[in-house]
C-alpha cells in the first residue's frame, strides 16, 4: 500500500527540496567531557546559525538545563558570547561543572590519566563516600563513561558488551577525556555555574536584553517517559517554562520533543516552530522541535516533513494527526 504524502512544514519552499540529513556529530568539535543522554552535539551547527546573526553579539548565554553543556562550551570556545551561565540541579553533574569553575579541571585530567580502569576499580571508586567536590566530579565521569548510555539516573548499570565487546572500556578514552578537561581551563573563568532550578534562573535574567537562552528541558510533556528514565530530576512545569519564555526581553532558542502537547503550548504562547532531523542512540532518524520567537533564519533550511506519529500519553494511547504544517505560530 502506498504511503500517503506528508505535508511540508515549509509549504512556501519548493516541493523537490532534498530531505535534510541529521548532523554527523563526528564533524562537530567535542568539547564536553560527558557522554550525555539527550546531548545536543548534533544541534551545534544550528545553534551557530542562530547566534551568529546577532550584532552586537549577546553578552551572556544562559543554559538553564545544562547537562553535558556542549552548547555553552561551543559559545565560549567560538567566541559567540563573553560569558555563560550554566545551570544544573543534578548534584553529580553539578559537581563536575563546579569543579571546573573552581579550578580543579587539571586535577581531574591527571586523575583520569592515572586511573587503571577495571570493573572492580570502578566499583571501589564510586562506592567511596564522604568525598570532596573534585572526587565526586571524578566519580561522576567514571559512571557517565562506564554506565549504559551514560545514564546517571537510578537504575542505570554498567555497560555489558559495548563497542566490539569492550564492555565498560568502550567509552573510556583517558587521553581524550584528559585533554577535554585541560582545555576547559581556558574558559573556566567565563563560566558562572549555578546548582539551581533552571526556571528560577530564567526568571532572574528575563529582563535583560543582552542575554540569550538555550533551553533544552527534560522531555516529559504529555506523559513522555524518556526524561523519567534518563534523568534523576525530570519533574518540570512545562507551562510555566513557556510562560517565562514569553516574558524574556532578550531571545531564546528551545529544543523539545515532537509531541502534540508541546506544539499546543507553543501555539498558545505565540511562538514559531520548526522540525529538525536528528539521530537517536539507536541510530534511527527522528525529528525534534525547534521553538523560538523568530525562526525566519531557518527558512533557508531544506523542508522537513512531519511523520504521522503515535504519541503515548498518560493513561491511554492515541493517534495524533500531524498532517498540519507547523508554521509560524499557526493554530
Q: Model-predicted segments: where are they?
A:
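SAM-dependent nucleic-acid methyltransferase catalytic core
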Residues: 2-51, 55-56, 94, 100-214, ...
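Long, positively charged, glycine-interspersed low-complexity recognition regions
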Residues: 3-11, 233-331
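Conserved S-adenosyl-L-methionine
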Residues: 56-117
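Short active-site oxyanion
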Residues: 58-61, 81-83, 188-192, 246-252
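Short His-Asn-centered micro-motif
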Residues: 64-65, 87-89, 194-196, 215-217, ...
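A residue-level signal for conserved active-site and pocket-lining positions in enzyme catalytic cores
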Residues: 67, 97, 141, 252, ...
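Short hydrophobic/aromatic-enriched beta-strand-loop microsegments
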Residues: 83-88, 109, 214, 270-278
Amino acid at each position: 500500500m502506498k504511503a500517503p504524502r506528508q505535508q511540508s512544514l515549509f509549504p512556501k519552499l519548493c516541493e523537490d527540496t532534498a530531505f535534510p540529513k541529521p548532523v554527523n556529530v563526528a564533524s562537530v568539535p567535542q568539547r564536553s567531557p560527558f557522554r550525555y543522554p539527550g546531548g545536543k552535539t548534533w544541534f551545534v551547527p544550528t545553534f551557530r546559525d542562530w547566534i551568529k546573526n546577532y550584532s552586537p553579539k549577546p553578552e551572556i548565554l544562559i543554559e538553564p538545563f545544562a547537562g553535558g553543556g556542549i552548547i555553552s562550551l561551543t559559545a565560549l570556545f567560538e567566541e559567540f558570547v563573553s560569558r555563560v551561565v550554566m545551570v544544573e540541579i543534578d548534584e553529580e553533574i553539578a559537581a563536575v561543572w563546579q569543579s571546573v569553575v573552581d579550578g580543579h579541571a587539571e586535577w581531574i585530567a591527571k586523575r583520569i590519566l592515572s586511573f587503571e580502569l577495571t570493573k572492580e576499580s570502578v566499583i571501589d571508586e564510586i562506592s567511596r563516600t564522604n568525598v570532596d567536590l573534585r572526587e565526586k566530579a571524578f566519580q561522576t565521569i567514571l559512571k557517565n563513561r562506564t554506565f549504559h548510555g551514560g545514564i546517571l539516573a537510578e537504575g542505570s548499570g554498567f555497560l555489558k558488551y559495548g563497542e566490539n565487546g569492550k564492555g565498560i572500556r568502550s567509552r573510556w578514552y583517558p587521553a581524550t577525556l584528559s585533554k577535554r578537561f585541560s582545555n576547559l581551563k581556558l574558559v573556566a573563568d567565563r563560566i558562572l555555574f549555578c546548582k539551581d532550578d533552571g526556571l528560577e534562573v530564567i526568571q532572574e535574567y528575563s529582563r535583560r536584553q543582552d542575554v540569550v537562552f538555550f533551553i533544552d528541558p527534560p522531555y516529559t510533556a504529555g506523559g513522555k517517559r524518556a526524561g523519567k528514565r534518563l534523568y534523576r530530576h525530570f519533574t518540570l512545569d512545562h507551562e510555566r517554562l513557556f510562560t517565562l519564555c514569553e516574558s524574556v526581553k532578550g531571545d531564546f532558542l528551545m529544543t523539545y520533543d515532537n509531541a502534540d502537547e508541546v506544539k499546543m503550548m507553543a501555539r498558545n504562547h505565540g511562538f514559531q516552530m520548526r522540525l529538525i532531523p536528528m539521530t537517536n542512540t539507536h541510530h534511527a532518524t527522528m525529528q525534534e522541535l525547534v521553538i523560538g520567537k523568530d525562526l525566519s533564519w531557518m527558512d533557508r533550511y531544506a523542508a522537513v516533513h512531519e511523520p504521522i506519529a503515535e504519541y503515548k500519553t498518560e493513561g491511554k494511547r492515541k493517534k495524533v494527526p500531524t498532517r498540519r504544517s507547523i508554521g509560524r505560530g499557526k493554530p
